[in-house]
Amino acid sequence: MNIAPRRPLFNRRPQSNIYRMFLWVMMILGGIWMIQKLTTGEIKPLFEPTPTPTRAVESFLLEGEANFTAGNLNNAITAYQEAVRVNPNDAVTWAKLARIQTYSSAFLITNAEKKERLLLALESARRAVELAPDDSTAHAILAFTLDWNANTSIYSDDLRQVDKFLVEAEQESLMALQKDNTNTLALAYYAEVLLDQQKWDLAEQFINQALEREDSNQMDVYRVNAAVLETLGQYNLAIPEYDKAIAIEPNFTFLYLRAGANYRRLALAILDPKAARPVYEKSLEYFQKAALINEQIGVKDPTPYLSISRTYSQLGEFFAAALNVQAALEFEPTNPDIYGQLGVVYFRSRNYEGSIFSLKCAIRGCSGDDSCLGRGLEKCNSALGPEYSENTIIGLPISPNTIVYYYIYGSVLSALSRPRDNKCGEANQIFSEVRAELVANPDAYTDGYQTIINIVQAGEAICQSLAEDGAPASSVLGEAVTSTPEVGVSDMTATPTP
């Protein structure tokens, strides 16, 4: 018996729907395609973060300005470099970067570091002018950067390059003023260029024009005005201008060094030691403030300690002076010039034996235990700290800046010579080198030529006497040393040394 199948009263039998199947197939194929694209990186996840968070240019500029004011110039440079990376066609930012790079060179120690930073600043300044050839400030900052590149200490072996920088700096200054003759920065920077060209009257004229402008309340303007007054010998007027610049940029230590040097120069002119003492102490305050700021912002610069040492030397406090030179050597234990300065301090304090080690390191170089003796230590012992480590020092060639170390060294060697400890061989070699330098560069020694010759002749006479009869040189030690101390180590210059 056939029984008909039961009808589905409550449930429908499943049936295939061709449209639904097609949709599923398309979704599966689409998913496979999506996975392949994600794997190859052609499609990024919707909420995946960007590789580098995007920051607005204004954010970098604010960060750079804040670091500049705080004295963290390396961080300021980094911020401005990021700003020009985001917006490479912004001439204003390139110009600001160049200005900061230029000023940052004052916080660097070696000439090689300064040269590298200043050349980078020059590239930035040229880029700003390239992007905005009609912008007065861009040309002014290029002039400023060129002027700071024209540094005779950096290019001592290529003075023609210094002249080239100065000529171009003047051209850019004139271009800046041609674009806008009321630009305060352009007026100030041009005054600085004129000052370095020794056109002092014109420099004074243009800085006065800058000071008359309503926006003259700028560190750059006060700094240049102070430099002009300082060069003209008006030290008492230069100091308040440096103070105004310091008030705007309180972490720019080179401003403190200049102000302190002006106080020391004023003190040197005061004949009464009691009256001069407070002025010297004011000088020390500025130098010590510079050292403290450097410590706070992480700048390892020996300059403040050398400035403190010079001030104590002028006060006749040679023990304190020597301690500060030794502190400077902790920052730069291979700098031969600092060894020379320590040797001069020892010499002026009549520590003649100690001066020999330091001066020898300065002009002949030294290494091993001799390097520690040159720093005033008994011997090297790195276990006591890094300041007791051995170092290799390369001697300084004779030049107008180093000749003082040579003739003092020769003078001490000859004066301390004895029949059984004759140092005249080395002394006479030094004297020969000094004479050769005087002949080779007579223009550099116009003022001190005769004094240096007298010192050389006194030393040669000692050695000649010793060679003839073996008489001990101690009988003429006083003559040899008393004619020497002030030569080449005083601050009797138009622009005081920090």
Predicted regions and their residues:
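Start-of-helix register in tetratricopeptide repeats
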Residues: 58, 92, 137, 144, ...
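Residue-level recognition of tetratricopeptide repeat
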Residues: 65, 99, 103-106, 144, ...
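Alpha-helical segment of the N-proximal tetratricopeptide repeat
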Residues: 55-86, 106-114, 156-159, 268, ...
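Canonical tetratricopeptide repeat
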Residues: 96, 141, 189, 223-224, ...
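Conserved structural position within tetratricopeptide repeats
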Residues: 82-85, 123-130, 171-178, 208-213, ...
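Short coil turns that delineate tetratricopeptide repeat
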Residues: 88, 133, 181, 215-216, ...
